[in-house]
Every structure is written in structure tokens, then in C-alpha cells.
């Protein structure tokens, strides 16, 4: 879960695809 937050800072919400790829 913490990793998701870190990625949210690096990638804007527009890149929500990145979050799904990691998860």
C-alpha cells in the first residue's frame, strides 16, 4: 500500500494505469 502512495507522487492521477500495472 505504501508503494502505491509513492507512485502517486511520481505519476499524476492521469497515469492511473501505472498503479494497476504494479498492483
UniProtKB/Swiss-Prot annotation:
<dbReference type="InterPro" id="IPR000874">
    <property type="entry name" value="Bombesin"/>
</dbReference>
<protein>
    <recommendedName>
        <fullName>Gastrin-releasing peptide</fullName>
    </recommendedName>
</protein>
<dbReference type="GO" id="GO:0007218">
    <property type="term" value="P:neuropeptide signaling pathway"/>
</dbReference>
<keyword id="KW-0968">Cytoplasmic vesicle</keyword>
<dbReference type="GO" id="GO:0090277">
    <property type="term" value="P:positive regulation of peptide hormone secretion"/>
</dbReference>
<dbReference type="GO" id="GO:0005615">
    <property type="term" value="C:extracellular space"/>
</dbReference>
<comment type="similarity">
    <text>Belongs to the bombesin/neuromedin-B/ranatensin family.</text>
</comment>
<keyword id="KW-0027">Amidation</keyword>
<dbReference type="GO" id="GO:0070852">
    <property type="term" value="C:cell body fiber"/>
</dbReference>
<dbReference type="GO" id="GO:0044297">
    <property type="term" value="C:cell body"/>
</dbReference>
<dbReference type="GO" id="GO:1900738">
    <property type="term" value="P:positive regulation of phospholipase C-activating G protein-coupled receptor signaling pathway"/>
</dbReference>
<keyword id="KW-0964">Secreted</keyword>
<dbReference type="Pfam" id="PF02044">
    <property type="entry name" value="Bombesin"/>
</dbReference>
<dbReference type="GO" id="GO:0034774">
    <property type="term" value="C:secretory granule lumen"/>
</dbReference>
<comment type="function">
    <text>Stimulates the release of gastrin and other gastrointestinal hormones.</text>
</comment>
<feature type="modified residue" description="Methionine amide">
    <location>
        <position position="23"/>
    </location>
</feature>
